[in-house]
Amino acid sequence: MAEKIDINRIQRDMFIEYKGEPYRVVDYDHVKPGKGQAFVRVKAKNMNTGNAIEITYKSSDSIELADFEQVFAEFSYKDADEYHFLTQNTHEMISINAEDIKEEAKFLKEGMTVVVFIYKNKPIGIELPKAVELEVIETDPGFKGDTAAGGSKPAKLETGAVIQVPFFINEGDIVKVDTRTGQYLERLDRAQKK
């Protein structure tokens, strides 16, 4: 049986079980109204369906932690409808339905190490590194003076993702991207690229 904890100990990225389904806590808010009992509002993402919900708990409630296994694995390849990962410890192949990791796949690159989440012996999702380094393969050229006004332009990355980058970024540049928000962080020198 899964462990139960006091709702006041909840944290972002914690895995909980709600109505028999696994959820990942996206955000939470402790609310203390002027009248009445304090409560905790939790925003969570269903790890099976990807749907987000909001759950309200009394401050005296306890929640059940979802019994997840987390496995480090390296992304190997993608076929028609699945992504395939090689576990680091056991060197077993794990396959995940492409629909289950649609958002994460935008920044997934061959050889990248990720965390695979396994729930009741079924892989249901992955966690990417917080930031990834990717090459810009397509963007409009920057012009002298563009940077004075600030602003941004779309750029297509080697994984197919399209993000907004500053005007001074050119094709062939290596950029660091936050995988949680999809935002450009910085441009890297080619020598800095791992």
Swiss-Prot record:
Species this protein is from: Hydrogenobaculum sp. (strain Y04AAS1)
CDD domains listed in its UniProt record: S1_EF-P_repeat_1, S1_EF-P_repeat_2
Pathway per the UniProt entry: Protein biosynthesis; polypeptide chain elongation
Pfam families: EFP, EFP_N, Elong-fact-P_C
Alphabetized InterPro entries for the sequence: Elong-fact-P_C, NA-bd_OB-fold, Rib_uL2_dom2, Transl_elong_fac_P/YeiP, Transl_elong_KOW-like, Transl_elong_P/YeiP_cen, Transl_elong_P/YeiP_CS, Transl_elongation_fac_P
Protein's name according to its UniProt entry: Elongation factor P
Function, in words: Involved in peptide bond synthesis. Stimulates efficient translation and peptide-bond synthesis on native or reconstituted 70S ribosomes in vitro. Probably functions indirectly by altering the affinity of the ribosome for aminoacyl-tRNA, thus increasing their reactivity as acceptors for peptidyl transferase.
Family to which the UniProt record says this protein belongs: Belongs to the elongation factor P family.
Record keywords: Cytoplasm, Elongation factor, Protein biosynthesis
PANTHER family per record: ELONGATION FACTOR P, ELONGATION FACTOR P (EF-P) FAMILY PROTEIN
SMART domains listed in its UniProt record: EFP, Elong-fact-P_C
Molecular-function annotations in GO: translation elongation factor activity
GO cellular component, one term: cytoplasm
Record localization: Cytoplasm
Keyword Cytoplasm: yes
GO biological process: peptide biosynthetic process
